[in-house]
Amino acid sequence: MIMFCVQCEQTIRTPAGNGCSYAQGMCGKTAETSDLQDLLIAALQGLSAWAVKAREYGIINHDVDSFAPRAFFSTLTNVNFDSPRIVGYAREAIALREALKAQCLAVDANARVDNPMADLQLVSDDLGELQRQAAEFTPNKDKAAIGENILGLRLLCLYGLKGAAAYMEHAHVLGQYDNDIYAQYHKIMAWLGTWPADMNALLECSMEIGQMNFKVMSILDAGETGKYGHPTPTQVNVKATAGKCILISGHDLKDLYNLLEQTEGTGVNVYTHGEMLPAHGYPELRKFKHLVGNYGSGWQNQQVEFARFPGPIVMTSNCIIDPTVSAYDDRIWTRSIVGWPGVRHLDGDDFSAVITQAQQMAGFPYSEIPHLITVGFGRQTLLGAADTLIDLVSREKLRHIFLLGGCDGARGERHYFTDFATIVPDDCLILTLACGKYRFNKLEFGDIEGLPRLVDAGQCNDAYSAIILAVTLAEKLGCGVNDLPLSLVLSWFEQKAIVILLTLLSLGVKNIVTGPTAPGFLTPDLLAVLNEKFGLRSITTVEEDMKQLLSA
Protein backbone atom coordinates (compact mmCIF):
# COMPACT_ATOMS: atom_id res chain seq x y z
CA MET A 1 0.00 0.00 0.00
CA ILE A 2 1.05 3.62 -0.49
CA MET A 3 0.93 6.59 1.83
CA PHE A 4 0.16 10.28 1.61
CA CYS A 5 2.19 12.71 3.69
CA VAL A 6 3.15 16.27 2.83
CA GLN A 7 3.88 17.65 6.29
CA CYS A 8 7.62 18.43 6.05
CA GLU A 9 9.95 20.42 3.81
CA GLN A 10 11.66 17.39 2.29
CA THR A 11 8.42 15.97 0.87
CA ILE A 12 8.53 14.83 -2.75
CA ARG A 13 7.50 17.51 -5.26
CA THR A 14 6.54 16.65 -8.84
CA PRO A 15 4.60 18.41 -11.61
CA ALA A 16 1.72 16.06 -10.82
CA GLY A 17 1.57 17.17 -7.19
CA ASN A 18 3.38 17.35 -3.88
CA GLY A 19 3.63 14.73 -1.17
CA CYS A 20 5.22 11.42 -0.31
CA SER A 21 2.85 8.84 -1.78
CA TYR A 22 5.00 5.77 -2.21
CA ALA A 23 6.10 2.81 -0.10
CA GLN A 24 8.31 5.09 1.98
CA GLY A 25 8.58 8.81 2.62
CA MET A 26 11.68 10.93 2.26
CA CYS A 27 12.05 10.98 6.06
CA GLY A 28 12.32 7.19 6.13
CA LYS A 29 8.76 6.67 7.40
CA THR A 30 7.20 3.60 5.82
CA ALA A 31 3.77 3.67 4.24
CA GLU A 32 2.60 1.37 7.03
CA THR A 33 3.68 3.78 9.77
CA SER A 34 2.37 6.82 7.90
CA ASP A 35 -1.04 5.25 7.35
CA LEU A 36 -1.25 4.10 10.96
CA GLN A 37 -0.46 7.65 12.05
CA ASP A 38 -3.49 8.78 10.02
CA LEU A 39 -5.54 6.21 11.93
CA LEU A 40 -4.14 7.45 15.24
CA ILE A 41 -5.03 11.04 14.36
CA ALA A 42 -8.61 9.96 13.60
CA ALA A 43 -8.79 8.22 16.99
CA LEU A 44 -7.45 11.34 18.68
CA GLN A 45 -10.05 13.48 16.92
CA GLY A 46 -12.75 11.20 18.30
CA LEU A 47 -11.22 11.47 21.77
CA SER A 48 -11.20 15.27 21.52
CA ALA A 49 -14.83 15.27 20.38
CA TRP A 50 -15.81 13.55 23.62
CA ALA A 51 -13.48 15.80 25.63
CA VAL A 52 -15.43 18.78 24.27
CA LYS A 53 -18.73 17.13 25.21
CA ALA A 54 -17.42 16.22 28.67
CA ARG A 55 -16.53 19.83 29.38
CA GLU A 56 -20.16 20.75 28.74
CA TYR A 57 -20.94 18.65 31.83
CA GLY A 58 -18.05 20.07 33.84
CA ILE A 59 -16.02 16.89 33.37
CA ILE A 60 -12.30 17.49 32.87
CA ASN A 61 -10.22 14.33 32.61
CA HIS A 62 -6.55 15.19 33.13
CA ASP A 63 -5.42 11.81 31.81
CA VAL A 64 -7.13 12.65 28.52
CA ASP A 65 -5.68 16.15 28.48
CA SER A 66 -2.12 14.95 29.03
CA PHE A 67 -2.34 11.98 26.66
CA ALA A 68 -3.95 13.60 23.62
CA PRO A 69 -1.24 16.14 22.67
CA ARG A 70 1.52 13.68 23.55
CA ALA A 71 0.14 11.02 21.22
CA PHE A 72 -0.42 13.62 18.49
CA PHE A 73 3.23 14.70 18.93
CA SER A 74 4.28 11.15 18.03
CA THR A 75 3.08 11.79 14.45
CA LEU A 76 5.33 14.84 13.97
CA THR A 77 8.18 14.54 11.46
CA ASN A 78 11.13 12.42 12.61
CA VAL A 79 9.63 11.42 15.95
CA ASN A 80 8.18 7.90 15.93
CA PHE A 81 8.70 5.31 13.19
CA ASP A 82 7.53 2.34 15.29
CA SER A 83 4.21 1.03 13.93
CA PRO A 84 3.21 -1.11 16.95
CA ARG A 85 3.68 1.85 19.28
CA ILE A 86 1.56 4.06 17.01
CA VAL A 87 -1.20 1.45 17.18
CA GLY A 88 -0.75 1.33 20.95
CA TYR A 89 -1.43 5.05 21.13
CA ALA A 90 -4.56 4.58 19.00
CA ARG A 91 -5.84 1.85 21.32
CA GLU A 92 -5.17 4.03 24.35
CA ALA A 93 -7.00 6.93 22.71
CA ILE A 94 -10.05 4.76 22.13
CA ALA A 95 -9.96 3.38 25.69
CA LEU A 96 -9.77 6.89 27.13
CA ARG A 97 -12.58 8.00 24.83
CA GLU A 98 -14.84 5.17 26.00
CA ALA A 99 -14.09 5.98 29.64
CA LEU A 100 -14.88 9.64 29.01
CA LYS A 101 -18.04 8.68 27.14
CA ALA A 102 -19.13 6.60 30.14
CA GLN A 103 -18.58 9.59 32.43
CA CYS A 104 -20.78 11.71 30.18
CA LEU A 105 -23.52 9.07 30.01
CA ALA A 106 -23.50 8.81 33.78
CA VAL A 107 -24.48 12.49 33.89
CA ASP A 108 -26.77 12.46 30.85
CA ALA A 109 -28.07 9.19 29.45
CA ASN A 110 -28.76 10.95 26.15
CA ALA A 111 -25.24 12.33 25.69
CA ARG A 112 -24.22 12.13 22.05
CA VAL A 113 -21.40 13.49 19.91
CA ASP A 114 -21.98 14.41 16.27
CA ASN A 115 -18.52 13.69 14.89
CA PRO A 116 -17.51 11.03 12.34
CA MET A 117 -14.57 10.00 14.54
CA ALA A 118 -16.53 9.76 17.80
CA ASP A 119 -17.13 6.00 17.69
CA LEU A 120 -14.11 4.80 15.73
CA GLN A 121 -12.98 1.26 16.58
CA LEU A 122 -9.92 -0.59 15.34
CA VAL A 123 -10.96 -3.48 13.13
CA SER A 124 -8.12 -5.87 13.91
CA ASP A 125 -4.87 -6.56 15.75
CA ASP A 126 -3.17 -7.17 12.43
CA LEU A 127 -1.10 -4.23 11.18
CA GLY A 128 -1.99 -4.95 7.56
CA GLU A 129 -5.72 -4.87 8.31
CA LEU A 130 -5.30 -1.66 10.30
CA GLN A 131 -3.38 -0.10 7.44
CA ARG A 132 -6.27 -0.91 5.12
CA GLN A 133 -8.67 0.64 7.63
CA ALA A 134 -6.47 3.74 7.75
CA ALA A 135 -7.21 4.40 4.07
CA GLU A 136 -10.54 5.85 5.26
CA PHE A 137 -8.64 8.62 7.00
CA THR A 138 -5.88 9.58 4.59
CA PRO A 139 -5.80 13.40 4.56
CA ASN A 140 -6.32 13.76 0.80
CA LYS A 141 -9.11 11.20 0.42
CA ASP A 142 -11.66 13.82 -0.72
CA LYS A 143 -9.25 16.04 -2.65
CA ALA A 144 -11.19 15.59 -5.89
CA ALA A 145 -14.34 16.89 -4.22
CA ILE A 146 -12.93 19.81 -2.21
CA GLY A 147 -9.97 20.94 -4.33
CA GLU A 148 -6.35 21.64 -3.47
CA ASN A 149 -6.97 24.95 -1.69
CA ILE A 150 -9.32 23.53 0.93
CA LEU A 151 -7.06 20.52 1.40
CA GLY A 152 -4.09 22.85 1.86
CA LEU A 153 -5.90 24.89 4.51
CA ARG A 154 -6.99 21.75 6.35
CA LEU A 155 -3.40 20.59 6.41
CA LEU A 156 -2.17 24.01 7.52
CA CYS A 157 -4.49 23.73 10.50
CA LEU A 158 -3.72 20.07 11.20
CA TYR A 159 0.04 20.52 11.00
CA GLY A 160 -0.07 23.77 12.93
CA LEU A 161 -2.08 22.12 15.70
CA LYS A 162 0.40 19.24 15.68
CA GLY A 163 3.22 21.70 16.33
CA ALA A 164 1.26 23.26 19.18
CA ALA A 165 0.60 19.79 20.62
CA ALA A 166 4.35 19.18 20.73
CA TYR A 167 4.87 22.35 22.76
CA MET A 168 1.93 21.40 25.01
CA GLU A 169 3.69 18.12 25.77
CA HIS A 170 6.99 19.90 26.49
CA ALA A 171 5.13 22.20 28.91
CA HIS A 172 3.21 19.32 30.51
CA VAL A 173 6.44 17.46 31.27
CA LEU A 174 7.48 20.52 33.29
CA GLY A 175 4.24 20.54 35.28
CA GLN A 176 2.45 23.25 33.31
CA TYR A 177 -1.30 23.02 32.72
CA ASP A 178 -3.85 25.55 31.49
CA ASN A 179 -7.42 24.32 31.17
CA ASP A 180 -8.30 26.99 28.61
CA ILE A 181 -5.50 25.80 26.31
CA TYR A 182 -6.61 22.17 26.51
CA ALA A 183 -10.26 23.10 25.95
CA GLN A 184 -9.26 25.06 22.85
CA TYR A 185 -7.03 22.25 21.62
CA HIS A 186 -9.83 19.68 21.90
CA LYS A 187 -12.31 22.00 20.19
CA ILE A 188 -10.02 22.52 17.19
CA MET A 189 -8.93 18.88 16.99
CA ALA A 190 -12.53 17.65 17.08
CA TRP A 191 -13.58 20.18 14.42
CA LEU A 192 -10.80 19.07 12.09
CA GLY A 193 -12.22 15.55 12.43
CA THR A 194 -15.40 16.73 10.70
CA TRP A 195 -13.50 17.30 7.43
CA PRO A 196 -14.34 21.05 7.28
CA ALA A 197 -14.48 22.64 3.83
CA ASP A 198 -15.20 26.33 4.44
CA MET A 199 -12.20 28.43 3.40
CA ASN A 200 -12.89 31.36 5.71
CA ALA A 201 -13.50 29.09 8.69
CA LEU A 202 -10.23 27.26 8.03
CA LEU A 203 -8.29 30.52 7.73
CA GLU A 204 -9.81 31.70 11.01
CA CYS A 205 -8.92 28.37 12.59
CA SER A 206 -5.29 28.71 11.54
CA MET A 207 -5.12 32.08 13.30
CA GLU A 208 -6.82 30.62 16.37
CA ILE A 209 -4.15 27.92 16.49
CA GLY A 210 -1.46 30.59 16.32
CA GLN A 211 -3.02 32.56 19.17
CA MET A 212 -3.39 29.41 21.24
CA ASN A 213 0.23 28.51 20.65
CA PHE A 214 1.36 31.88 21.99
CA LYS A 215 -0.26 30.88 25.30
CA VAL A 216 1.38 27.47 25.08
CA MET A 217 4.82 29.02 24.57
CA SER A 218 4.15 31.28 27.55
CA ILE A 219 3.51 28.38 29.93
CA LEU A 220 6.43 26.44 28.45
CA ASP A 221 8.68 29.43 29.13
CA ALA A 222 7.31 29.56 32.68
CA GLY A 223 7.98 25.85 33.14
CA GLU A 224 11.56 25.99 31.90
CA THR A 225 12.55 29.15 33.75
CA GLY A 226 10.65 28.14 36.89
CA LYS A 227 12.54 24.87 37.19
CA TYR A 228 15.94 25.72 35.78
CA GLY A 229 16.26 29.50 36.20
CA HIS A 230 16.43 32.22 33.59
CA PRO A 231 19.07 31.62 30.91
CA THR A 232 22.02 33.98 30.95
CA PRO A 233 24.86 34.34 28.43
CA THR A 234 27.14 31.34 28.75
CA GLN A 235 30.09 30.08 26.76
CA VAL A 236 29.83 26.51 25.49
CA ASN A 237 32.68 24.35 24.22
CA VAL A 238 31.91 22.65 20.90
CA LYS A 239 35.01 20.45 20.95
CA ALA A 240 35.63 17.10 22.63
CA THR A 241 36.77 16.65 26.23
CA ALA A 242 38.66 13.49 27.17
CA GLY A 243 36.58 10.86 28.94
CA LYS A 244 33.51 8.65 28.85
CA CYS A 245 30.49 10.34 27.36
CA ILE A 246 26.75 10.42 26.65
CA LEU A 247 25.07 12.56 23.98
CA ILE A 248 21.54 13.84 24.56
CA SER A 249 19.43 15.33 21.77
CA GLY A 250 15.98 16.84 21.45
CA HIS A 251 14.12 19.47 23.47
CA ASP A 252 13.34 17.91 26.84
CA LEU A 253 15.25 19.79 29.55
CA LYS A 254 13.79 17.54 32.26
CA ASP A 255 15.38 14.48 30.66
CA LEU A 256 18.69 16.33 30.55
CA TYR A 257 18.39 17.30 34.21
CA ASN A 258 17.62 13.72 35.24
CA LEU A 259 20.54 12.43 33.19
CA LEU A 260 22.90 14.99 34.74
CA GLU A 261 21.78 14.05 38.24
CA GLN A 262 22.27 10.35 37.57
CA THR A 263 25.68 10.74 35.89
CA GLU A 264 27.11 13.03 38.57
CA GLY A 265 30.16 11.40 40.13
CA THR A 266 30.24 8.53 37.62
CA GLY A 267 33.04 9.95 35.49
CA VAL A 268 30.72 10.18 32.48
CA ASN A 269 30.57 13.51 30.65
CA VAL A 270 27.35 14.73 29.04
CA TYR A 271 27.14 16.56 25.71
CA THR A 272 24.14 18.31 24.22
CA HIS A 273 23.13 17.94 20.60
CA GLY A 274 20.80 19.89 18.32
CA GLU A 275 18.02 21.79 20.06
CA MET A 276 19.44 20.84 23.47
CA LEU A 277 22.25 23.41 22.99
CA PRO A 278 20.36 26.25 24.77
CA ALA A 279 20.26 24.13 27.95
CA HIS A 280 23.76 25.36 28.78
CA GLY A 281 22.33 28.81 29.52
CA TYR A 282 20.06 27.63 32.37
CA PRO A 283 21.70 28.01 35.84
CA GLU A 284 20.25 24.77 37.25
CA LEU A 285 21.62 22.79 34.31
CA ARG A 286 25.03 24.38 33.79
CA LYS A 287 25.83 23.94 37.50
CA PHE A 288 26.68 20.33 36.64
CA LYS A 289 30.38 20.45 35.78
CA HIS A 290 30.20 17.27 33.72
CA LEU A 291 27.88 19.01 31.23
CA VAL A 292 31.01 19.66 29.22
CA GLY A 293 29.83 20.90 25.84
CA ASN A 294 27.83 20.63 22.66
CA TYR A 295 28.58 18.05 19.98
CA GLY A 296 27.76 18.06 16.29
CA SER A 297 25.76 20.33 14.03
CA GLY A 298 22.28 20.25 12.49
CA TRP A 299 20.08 17.20 13.06
CA GLN A 300 20.34 16.19 9.40
CA ASN A 301 24.04 15.34 9.86
CA GLN A 302 23.47 12.88 12.69
CA GLN A 303 24.12 9.70 10.71
CA VAL A 304 27.73 10.80 10.23
CA GLU A 305 28.22 12.56 13.56
CA PHE A 306 26.51 9.97 15.77
CA ALA A 307 28.56 7.22 14.14
CA ARG A 308 31.70 9.05 15.31
CA PHE A 309 30.49 9.75 18.84
CA PRO A 310 32.22 7.28 21.22
CA GLY A 311 29.30 6.80 23.59
CA PRO A 312 25.54 6.20 23.77
CA ILE A 313 22.99 8.69 22.45
CA VAL A 314 19.60 9.57 23.96
CA MET A 315 16.84 11.02 21.76
CA THR A 316 14.26 12.88 23.85
CA SER A 317 12.09 14.29 21.03
CA ASN A 318 12.47 15.10 17.34
CA CYS A 319 14.59 14.60 15.30
CA ILE A 320 15.67 10.96 14.84
CA ILE A 321 16.66 9.47 11.49
CA ASP A 322 17.58 5.91 10.58
CA PRO A 323 20.39 4.79 12.94
CA THR A 324 20.93 1.49 11.14
CA VAL A 325 22.54 3.18 8.12
CA SER A 326 25.69 3.98 10.06
CA ALA A 327 25.35 1.05 12.48
CA TYR A 328 24.98 2.88 15.80
CA ASP A 329 21.50 1.48 16.47
CA ASP A 330 22.94 -0.61 19.32
CA ARG A 331 23.84 2.53 21.29
CA ILE A 332 21.02 4.95 20.54
CA TRP A 333 18.12 5.11 22.99
CA THR A 334 14.68 6.69 22.63
CA ARG A 335 12.60 8.42 25.27
CA SER A 336 8.99 9.53 25.62
CA ILE A 337 7.20 9.70 22.24
CA VAL A 338 10.32 8.91 20.17
CA GLY A 339 10.59 5.51 18.50
CA TRP A 340 12.54 3.57 15.91
CA PRO A 341 12.00 -0.16 15.23
CA GLY A 342 14.57 -2.28 17.07
CA VAL A 343 16.01 0.62 19.07
CA ARG A 344 15.88 0.35 22.86
CA HIS A 345 13.27 2.57 24.49
CA LEU A 346 13.45 4.09 27.98
CA ASP A 347 9.97 4.00 29.50
CA GLY A 348 10.79 6.04 32.59
CA ASP A 349 13.37 8.41 34.03
CA ASP A 350 15.99 5.77 34.86
CA PHE A 351 19.09 6.24 32.69
CA SER A 352 21.21 3.60 34.46
CA ALA A 353 21.37 1.31 31.42
CA VAL A 354 22.63 4.19 29.27
CA ILE A 355 25.21 5.14 31.89
CA THR A 356 26.43 1.54 32.14
CA GLN A 357 26.86 1.42 28.38
CA ALA A 358 28.81 4.70 28.44
CA GLN A 359 31.15 3.32 31.08
CA GLN A 360 31.83 0.27 28.90
CA MET A 361 32.73 2.36 25.86
CA ALA A 362 35.99 4.10 25.05
CA GLY A 363 34.87 7.71 25.19
CA PHE A 364 37.00 10.50 23.77
CA PRO A 365 40.73 9.64 24.06
CA TYR A 366 41.93 13.24 24.39
CA SER A 367 40.67 16.80 24.73
CA GLU A 368 40.62 18.97 21.64
CA ILE A 369 41.53 22.65 21.63
CA PRO A 370 38.35 24.36 22.89
CA HIS A 371 36.14 26.39 20.57
CA LEU A 372 33.66 28.46 22.55
CA ILE A 373 30.32 29.82 21.37
CA THR A 374 27.86 31.86 23.42
CA VAL A 375 24.26 30.90 24.19
CA GLY A 376 21.77 31.89 26.88
CA PHE A 377 20.14 35.12 25.73
CA GLY A 378 16.81 34.21 27.25
CA ARG A 379 13.75 36.38 27.76
CA GLN A 380 15.00 38.12 30.91
CA THR A 381 18.40 38.86 29.38
CA LEU A 382 16.83 40.15 26.17
CA LEU A 383 14.45 42.44 28.05
CA GLY A 384 17.37 43.67 30.13
CA ALA A 385 19.09 44.72 26.92
CA ALA A 386 16.07 46.58 25.50
CA ASP A 387 17.23 50.03 26.62
CA THR A 388 20.73 49.35 25.29
CA LEU A 389 19.28 48.41 21.91
CA ILE A 390 17.17 51.56 21.82
CA ASP A 391 20.19 53.68 22.75
CA LEU A 392 22.28 52.11 20.00
CA VAL A 393 19.52 52.71 17.47
CA SER A 394 19.08 56.32 18.56
CA ARG A 395 22.82 56.95 18.19
CA GLU A 396 22.80 55.24 14.78
CA LYS A 397 25.20 52.59 16.00
CA LEU A 398 22.63 49.85 15.39
CA ARG A 399 20.83 50.03 12.05
CA HIS A 400 18.77 46.85 11.94
CA ILE A 401 18.01 43.57 13.74
CA PHE A 402 17.56 40.36 11.78
CA LEU A 403 15.77 37.44 13.39
CA LEU A 404 17.48 34.65 11.47
CA GLY A 405 16.23 31.33 12.78
CA GLY A 406 14.05 28.29 12.39
CA CYS A 407 14.65 24.70 11.37
CA ASP A 408 17.67 23.21 9.66
CA GLY A 409 17.54 20.52 6.98
CA ALA A 410 19.49 18.80 4.24
CA ARG A 411 18.38 20.80 1.19
CA GLY A 412 21.33 22.52 -0.49
CA GLU A 413 19.43 25.79 -0.82
CA ARG A 414 19.71 26.17 2.95
CA HIS A 415 23.21 27.55 2.44
CA TYR A 416 21.24 30.75 1.82
CA PHE A 417 21.01 31.23 5.59
CA THR A 418 24.78 30.93 6.06
CA ASP A 419 25.38 33.37 3.23
CA PHE A 420 22.78 35.77 4.59
CA ALA A 421 24.36 35.78 8.04
CA THR A 422 27.82 36.45 6.65
CA ILE A 423 26.75 39.54 4.66
CA VAL A 424 24.73 41.16 7.46
CA PRO A 425 26.35 44.62 7.81
CA ASP A 426 28.56 45.30 10.82
CA ASP A 427 26.07 47.79 12.26
CA CYS A 428 23.30 45.16 12.34
CA LEU A 429 22.51 42.46 14.88
CA ILE A 430 21.48 38.83 14.31
CA LEU A 431 18.99 37.32 16.74
CA THR A 432 18.76 33.57 16.26
CA LEU A 433 16.88 30.60 17.66
CA ALA A 434 16.11 26.95 16.86
CA CYS A 435 18.43 24.55 15.05
CA GLY A 436 18.79 26.71 11.94
CA LYS A 437 21.48 28.54 13.92
CA TYR A 438 23.90 25.68 13.23
CA ARG A 439 24.31 27.15 9.74
CA PHE A 440 26.34 30.02 11.22
CA ASN A 441 26.65 29.84 15.03
CA LYS A 442 30.31 28.82 15.00
CA LEU A 443 31.32 31.87 12.94
CA GLU A 444 32.71 35.05 14.49
CA PHE A 445 30.49 38.14 14.27
CA GLY A 446 32.09 40.52 16.75
CA ASP A 447 30.10 43.08 18.72
CA ILE A 448 28.58 46.55 18.69
CA GLU A 449 29.93 48.49 21.69
CA GLY A 450 30.17 45.28 23.70
CA LEU A 451 26.83 43.85 22.58
CA PRO A 452 27.37 40.61 20.63
CA ARG A 453 26.20 40.82 17.04
CA LEU A 454 25.04 37.18 17.21
CA VAL A 455 22.47 36.68 19.97
CA ASP A 456 21.26 33.11 20.55
CA ALA A 457 17.80 33.25 22.13
CA GLY A 458 17.35 29.47 22.47
CA GLN A 459 15.14 26.69 21.15
CA CYS A 460 12.39 27.08 18.56
CA ASN A 461 9.80 27.68 21.29
CA ASP A 462 11.92 30.59 22.52
CA ALA A 463 10.41 32.55 19.66
CA TYR A 464 8.25 33.59 22.61
CA SER A 465 11.21 35.53 24.04
CA ALA A 466 11.86 37.22 20.70
CA ILE A 467 8.19 38.21 20.44
CA ILE A 468 8.20 39.67 23.95
CA LEU A 469 11.38 41.62 23.13
CA ALA A 470 9.82 43.01 19.94
CA VAL A 471 6.65 44.05 21.78
CA THR A 472 8.73 45.69 24.52
CA LEU A 473 10.86 47.62 22.02
CA ALA A 474 7.75 48.78 20.18
CA GLU A 475 6.13 49.97 23.41
CA LYS A 476 9.25 51.86 24.47
CA LEU A 477 9.57 53.48 21.05
CA GLY A 478 5.85 54.24 20.77
CA CYS A 479 5.39 52.35 17.51
CA GLY A 480 4.05 49.05 16.22
CA VAL A 481 6.11 45.87 15.96
CA ASN A 482 6.01 46.13 12.17
CA ASP A 483 7.53 49.63 12.39
CA LEU A 484 10.67 48.43 14.18
CA PRO A 485 14.02 48.12 12.36
CA LEU A 486 13.46 44.37 12.58
CA SER A 487 13.17 41.72 9.86
CA LEU A 488 12.28 38.06 10.24
CA VAL A 489 14.02 35.61 7.92
CA LEU A 490 12.85 32.14 8.89
CA SER A 491 13.77 28.65 7.74
CA TRP A 492 11.14 25.95 8.09
CA PHE A 493 11.19 22.17 8.05
CA GLU A 494 8.36 20.69 10.08
CA GLN A 495 5.22 21.32 12.09
CA LYS A 496 6.73 23.25 15.00
CA ALA A 497 7.93 25.82 12.48
CA ILE A 498 4.45 25.93 10.95
CA VAL A 499 2.83 26.78 14.28
CA ILE A 500 5.50 29.38 15.08
CA LEU A 501 4.67 31.02 11.75
CA LEU A 502 0.94 30.90 12.54
CA THR A 503 1.69 32.43 15.94
CA LEU A 504 3.57 35.33 14.39
CA LEU A 505 0.87 35.91 11.76
CA SER A 506 -1.91 35.73 14.36
CA LEU A 507 -0.12 38.46 16.33
CA GLY A 508 -0.08 40.69 13.25
CA VAL A 509 3.60 40.37 12.38
CA LYS A 510 4.04 41.13 8.69
CA ASN A 511 6.58 40.89 5.89
CA ILE A 512 8.19 37.66 7.09
CA VAL A 513 10.58 36.03 4.63
CA THR A 514 10.67 32.22 4.67
CA GLY A 515 12.55 29.42 2.95
CA PRO A 516 14.16 27.49 1.52
CA THR A 517 10.90 26.44 -0.16
CA ALA A 518 7.22 27.02 0.48
CA PRO A 519 5.37 24.21 2.30
CA GLY A 520 4.25 21.60 -0.20
CA PHE A 521 0.66 21.68 1.04
CA LEU A 522 0.25 25.41 0.34
CA THR A 523 -1.03 26.03 -3.18
CA PRO A 524 -0.09 29.11 -5.24
CA ASP A 525 -3.53 30.51 -4.43
CA LEU A 526 -2.99 30.11 -0.69
CA LEU A 527 0.50 31.58 -0.86
CA ALA A 528 -0.99 34.57 -2.69
CA VAL A 529 -3.57 35.02 0.08
CA LEU A 530 -0.86 34.93 2.76
CA ASN A 531 1.24 37.38 0.79
CA GLU A 532 -1.65 39.79 0.32
CA LYS A 533 -2.84 39.57 3.93
CA PHE A 534 0.49 39.39 5.76
CA GLY A 535 3.23 40.24 3.26
CA LEU A 536 4.59 36.71 3.71
CA ARG A 537 7.00 35.80 0.92
CA SER A 538 9.69 33.31 0.00
CA ILE A 539 13.42 34.00 -0.10
CA THR A 540 14.97 35.06 -3.41
CA THR A 541 18.70 35.79 -3.43
CA VAL A 542 20.74 36.83 -0.42
CA GLU A 543 21.71 40.13 -2.03
CA GLU A 544 18.20 41.06 -3.18
CA ASP A 545 16.59 40.13 0.13
CA MET A 546 19.21 42.03 2.14
CA LYS A 547 18.75 45.12 -0.01
CA GLN A 548 14.97 44.99 0.27
CA LEU A 549 14.89 44.36 4.03
CA LEU A 550 17.34 47.14 4.84
CA SER A 551 15.38 49.62 2.74
CA ALA A 552 11.96 48.70 4.12
UniProtKB/Swiss-Prot annotation:
- Classify the source by domain of life: Bacteria
Q: Which residues bind hybrid [4Fe-2O-2S] cluster?
A: H251, E275, C319, C407, C435, C460, E494, K496
Q: Where in the cell is it found?
A: Cytoplasm
Cofactor dependency: [2Fe-2S] cluster; hybrid [4Fe-2O-2S] cluster
One Gene Ontology CC term in the entry = cytoplasm
Q: Is DNA-binding there in the keyword field?
A: no
- Record-listed Cysteine persulfide modification sites: C407
Q: Which GO terms describe its molecular function?
A: 2 iron, 2 sulfur cluster binding; hydroxylamine reductase activity; metal ion binding; peroxidase activity
Q: Give the UniProt keywords, A-Z.
A: 2Fe-2S, Cytoplasm, Iron, Iron-sulfur, Metal-binding, Oxidoreductase
Q: What is this protein called?
A: Hydroxylamine reductase
**Bilayer-crossing regions:** none
Its top-level enzyme class, in one word, is oxidoreductase
InterPro entries assigned to the protein according to its UniProt record, in alphabetical order: HCP/CODH, Hydroxylam_reduct, Prismane-like_a/b-sand, Prismane-like_sf, Prismane_a-bundle
* Function text: Catalyzes the reduction of hydroxylamine to form NH(3) and H(2)O.
User: Which SUPFAM superfamilies does this one have?
Assistant: Prismane protein-like
A Gene Ontology annotation in the biological process aspect, one of them, is: response to hydrogen peroxide
Reactions that this protein is recorded to catalyse: A + NH4(+) + H2O = hydroxylamine + AH2 + H(+)
Name of one Pfam family that matches: Prismane
Q: How is the cofactor bound?
A: Binds 1 [2Fe-2S] cluster. Binds 1 hybrid [4Fe-2O-2S] cluster.
UniProt-listed Enzyme Commission number(s): 1.7.99.1
Q: Where does [2Fe-2S] cluster bind?
A: C5, C8, C20, C27
